[in-house]
């Protein structure tokens, strides 16, 4: 039986890394982005490519319907959609806050709902992994919007994991610190900013999409068959221990 996975936000840094690892393991892939040209640029004519906005009910359902039209029922979901909107809450516009919620929380809810619905219709078990953030786990200045969105995502993971465990559907999340991705490029644009960001972690450094993808793909695998409702930190100890100040 073919292994079929759905990767949302597939043209981004984390999405591409997840796609590469799953493809190397022989998975058939459904890859999504809001812009078709981004998918073409990232993957050429590989994989089933679906341009859709998964932050809407219609967009999320469109993705799963496209899979069904190609006789594909994904049993794994890697939801890699998200953005970073920084700024103290008294200075953040309503539009930026809503955009942050839409990209990081609402898209996760609608995509996970459509994915679970497809699995239940097929009477199939499955696994999903979503991307949270260290900002949901520890207070960080100017991260109010993304912290609220990602904390909501973590609650979604735990609630959905409880609801669908009896169906054999596992749902987990990963919570990275800052990584080498287009979304974070502005934060670490200068050498000084990069060094400052790297030093804030007890294990200093900037994370890579590939190391996060490795953890995500493991959570989707049979090796994690008894893991559900968990949020796995990959943040150099940022959210759990203090760095040694020298």
Regions found by a protein language model. Name each.
Residues 112, 149, 157:
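Active-site helix of classical SDR
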Residues 228-246:
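Short C-terminal tail/terminal secondary-structure segment
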Residues 133:
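Residue(s) in the substrate-gating loop at a strand-loop-helix junction
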Residues 173, 192-227, 234-236:
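C-terminal helical subdomain
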Residues 117, 162-166, 225:
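Alpha-helical segment proximal to the catalytic Tyr-Lys
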Residues 88-89, 93-101, 197:
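Substrate-binding pocket helix/loop in short-chain dehydrogenase/reductase
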Residues 11-12:
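Conserved glycine-rich cofactor-binding loop
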């Amino acid at each position: 039986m073919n292994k079929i996975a759905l990767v949302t936000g597939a043209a981004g840094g984390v999405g591409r890394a997840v796609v590469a690892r799953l493809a190397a393991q022989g998975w058939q892939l459904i890859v999504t982005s809001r812009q078709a040209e981004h998918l073409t640029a990232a993957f050429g004519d590989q994989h089933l490519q679906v341009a859709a906005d998964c932050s809407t009910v219609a967009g999320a359902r469109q993705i799963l319907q496209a899979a069904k039209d190609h006789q594909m029922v994904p049993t794994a979901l890697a939801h890699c959609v998200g953005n970073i909107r920084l700024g103290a809450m008294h200075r953040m516009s309503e539009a930026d806050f809503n955009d942050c919620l839409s990209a990081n929380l609402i898209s996760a809810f609608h995509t996970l709902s459509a994915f679970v619905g497809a699995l239940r219709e097929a009477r199939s078990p499955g696994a999903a992994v979503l991307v949270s953030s260290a900002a949901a786990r520890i207070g960080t200045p100017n991260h109010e919007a993304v912290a609220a969105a990602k904390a909501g995502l973590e609650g979604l993971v735990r609630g959905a994991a409880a609801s669908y465990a009896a169906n054999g559907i596992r749902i987990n999340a990963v919570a990275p610190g800052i990584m080498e991705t287009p979304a974070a490029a502005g934060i670490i644009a200068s050498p000084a900013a990069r060094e400052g960001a790297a030093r804030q972690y007890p294990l200093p450094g900037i994370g890579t999409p590939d190391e996060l993808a490795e953890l995500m793909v493991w959570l989707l695998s049979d090796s994690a068959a008894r893991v559900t409702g968990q949020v796995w930190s990959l943040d150099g100890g940022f959210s759990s221990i203090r760095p040694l100040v020298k």
